[in-house]
Regions:
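Positively charged n-region of N-terminal signal peptides that target proteins for export
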Residues: 1-4
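Boundary at the C-terminal end of the N-terminal hydrophobic targeting segment
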Residues: 18-20
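Bacterial N-terminal signal peptides
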Residues: 6-16
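Extended, histidine- and acidic-residue-enriched regions that form the cofactor-binding/catalytic faces
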Residues: 22-102, 106-114, 120-128, 132-150, ...
Length: 290
């Protein structure tokens, strides 16, 4: 009987160890959690849709005056998820919220997609519908006591200009301070530093950032170099829909690498760059008395 019990204990112990190893192997290195909870933080969570209204009132604006609003869209991204433009800024906000002492507004997942709107699974919101909706969101954030409204934009094209325009309007009308960040442009130097070349839409930079968040969203087995096309120089040619779901900033550069180590390094460098910009801009706003 003792032998049976001993064998059973050994079996259970081994199974537990094996299960733990499997969990470690399958857990993405930078997988974001559903809630940014910290026992040592000012609040139970940094996410506005997860916090209770009474706790929100206790910290905004007395202790927290900054809010991060991730914006994106649904469109093709080579061999990564259609929602990469939402996945990236959402994860970014979760990574930097505490460092920048900010709350996180719910992600705005639909946007002005543009030339890739005809691909399967893509959505296109007109500027006429998008502009007033975004403006009311920013006005709502101002009404709730946020002084610094930071838009972490995950999608370029015409959406960037609209966000910048609306943010400027709300800043003037509501006497708040706004900042619009296109992370892939801001982190251009980091892209070249980590990957040794320029990036692209769904290129080495964006694919790497998503791979660092969740490798299961990346499908290298589906990848072919022929899936990529370099963006044309101004005035040369224009195609709608754009003929490839991977758009390279420079010809011959930016193809996805699928290198986990570089992806993790890039993820950290980009987050640091964005966080440092926000901290610096807010500090200088304060110094100027704006």
């Amino acid at each position: 009987m003792k032998k049976v019990v001993t064998l059973l204990v050994v079996f259970i112990t081994l199974q537990t160890l094996v299960s733990g190893q499997i969990m470690k192997k399958t857990q993405p290195s930078n997988q974001t959690t559903k809630s940014t909870v910290s026992t040592n933080d000012l609040v139970s969570t940094r996410e506005m849709d997860r916090i209770n209204w009474m706790e929100f009132r206790e910290v905004v604006p007395s202790k927290i005056q900054t809010v991060l609003l991730p914006t994106g869209t649904l469109e093709p991204h080579g061999v990564i998820n259609n929602g990469a433009d939402n996945t990236a800024p959402t994860a970014m906000a979760q990574q930097i919220a505490r460092r920048t002492n900010a709350m996180i507004a719910p992600t705005l997942p639909y946007g002005i997609t543009g030339s890739m709107a005809d691909y399967p699974g893509a959505f296109q919101i007109t500027e006429a519908a998008y502009r007033p909706f975004v403006k009311q969101i920013l006005e709502g954030l101002a009404k709730n006591g946020f002084r610094n409204i930071i838009i972490l934009n995950g999608h370029g094209g015409g959406q960037t200009a609209v966000l910048q325009s609306v943010a400027a309007e709300v800043s003037a009308e509501k006497k708040v301070r706004t900042l619009v960040i296109n992370w892939w442009s801001l982190a251009s130097d980091e892209t070249k530093e980590v990957f040794g070349e320029d990036g692209g839409h769904a290129g080495n930079n964006e694919t790497g950032y998503i791979q660092a968040i969740d490798p299961s969203l990346v499908h290298p087995e589906r990848y072919k170099d022929d899936m990529a096309t370099a963006y044309p120089a101004a005035g040369t040619w224009s195609a709608v829909p754009f003929p490839s779901s991977i758009g390279l900033y420079q010809k011959g550069q930016g193809y996805p690498k699928f290198d986990q180590k570089k992806a993790d390094e890039y993820f950290k460098k980009v987050n640091d760059k964005v966080a440092n910009l926000i901290i610096d801009v807010v500090r200088k706003w304060d110094l100027a008395g704006l």
